[in-house]
Amino acid sequence: QNEVSRINRDLVKLSKKAVGEHILVAGDMTTTGKPADPEDSAGYQLLFDAYREQAQALIDGGADLLGVETMMGVNECIAAIEAIRSLGDIAVLCTLSVQSDGKCYFDGTVFEAAEVLQALGVDAIGVNCSTGPDQLESVVRALHEMTDLPIVAKPNAGMPKILETGEAVYSMQADTFAAHMGQLVEAGASLIGGCCGTTPEYIGALRGLKR
């Protein structure tokens, strides 16, 4: 509990050492797993402080940018971005985990988030995790049409099958994943990657897509 800052600083330093000088390293932040209530000022302050502590540590560790990802609702995104912006102008990408219609799992939609977060100064907005690339084309297209910000798309390798052991198995192969990601690029995504179920093979398959 008291090692948050040290752990985050060390992780950034290790990552930068691993990739060398020519690759940017993003400091990663995510949901707390609990819905944020905008009417609960004390709860919001706790959330703000938690995100601010982590963001400061990532910046101190040398992160080139911050990625706020797999966010479950608009309200927690606001707390995270306001916390980061209280520290300065480091580049921030924010992606939400959504259903195929763009609805978030806690509150609001990714479209509502895009409007609010653009006003707060994020540098890119988009979606990650939750579903496969085959279910996000309309969401990406709508985001691209409503904002001038770069659109991020980092979906799962399809929808998982949960085994009796509790293990999640993703059936979408790398070539199929890349083909669907190509459609997301055509729909407006300019920053792409993968989330659950993807491996270096999947990311490698994306390199062949037209930029």
Model-predicted regions and their roles:
Residues 1-211:
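Domain-level signal for soluble alpha/beta catalytic cores
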